[in-house]
From Swiss-Prot:
Subcellular location field: Cytoplasm
Known partners and oligomeric status: Homotetramer.
PROSITE patterns assigned to the protein according to its UniProt record, in alphabetical order: ARGININOSUCCIN_SYN_1, ARGININOSUCCIN_SYN_2
Pfam family, one: Arginosuc_synth
Primary enzyme class: ligase
Protein name: Argininosuccinate synthase
Amino acid sequence: MTEKIVLAYSGGLDTSVAIPWLKDKGYEVIAVVLNVGQPNADFDAIQQKALNVGALDSIVVDAQDEFADHYVAPVIKANALYEGDYPLVSALSRPLIIEHLVKIAHAQNATAIAHGSTGKGNDQVRFEAAIHALDPEMKIEAPIRDFHWSREEEIDYAKEHNVPVPIGKKSPYSIDANLWGRANEAGILENPWNQAPDDAWGMTVSPEAAPDDPTFIDLTFKQGVPVALNDEPMALATMIKELNKLAGDNGIGRIDKIENRLVGIKSREVYEAPAAAVIMAAHHDLENLTLERDVQHFKPTIEDKITNMIYEAQWISPLFDALMAFIDKTQAVVNGTVKMKLYKGNATAVARKSAHNSLYDEDLATYTSADSFDQEAAAGFIKLWTLPTTVFEQVNHVHSEEKQHD
């Protein structure tokens, strides 16, 4: 009996050439594509393309709301930016994709799962770590990695097997996109001294071409998650789409960086994440207003670990669950509205309010006659605050001269 294999399918070059390759190995291929909000994607065409190049069946799963509510929302609450700027665009969708692929594999009595990742990328680890966690007995095929294709060889193989090739050898970008953003690599971008050309960007205008007048928006959060845009309640997936357009039109969300990959190499990545740039900036600003100081100062330690765990394929782990429980606890008070100014590549918080959770007390902060802060208590506080270092210094005189006594 012919074995069935479930392929994580995107419609792109890597996963399209995987279909005839897997068929040559004797598998019946079931292509599965997840709709996680890929901009401008024609899922009917993608589904048909898989069938045209030889898949036994082609399945489309609409997972946009699931992706936003269960994968994007946690990274918003955790301010998760890998190496300080990358909002984990591709890394976020991988465990969700595998969760659905494993379910479909079980339903279809498939014995294997395939992906189109290369041996140099992070996604091979993310896909296979999730498969091992969810079903250790499931076989794994990785044709692009295991056959050692170069990009040029892959294009030639595609043409030999009648797989449509929408790119050329001179500019073979590799693009991955979802609700949360767009990742672009390869081609001219592989030389870090080459500036990203205009055609490398797909969700944003250049900041120079953005409108000369700023756009102002209000983002309302409930327990750390945005729930309304300009006072209009909406699902998170819908809001992200709206903000991708608004922020993208203002040139916001471009990231051009050298990134440390999980597999140990540095890579040049070009990302666009317009909605993420706005939401993350607004969320961080609201935390400044609502989080107690010690919590606010300690939280980045947990955020950094969570961010690295997501990037490094450790979403499915007890430590990740425990750390997210801490994050969720902190977000109970992150309720309020932030006014954002979108202008020529910048998303800036210009006002904020929280009716029930603001820790800002104007009477304490003011320098006017309405000041209620007890300034006379400051001298005693300072003396007690510095007592440990004062005693140490007077005993050891590391930074001071010892007084001579007669």
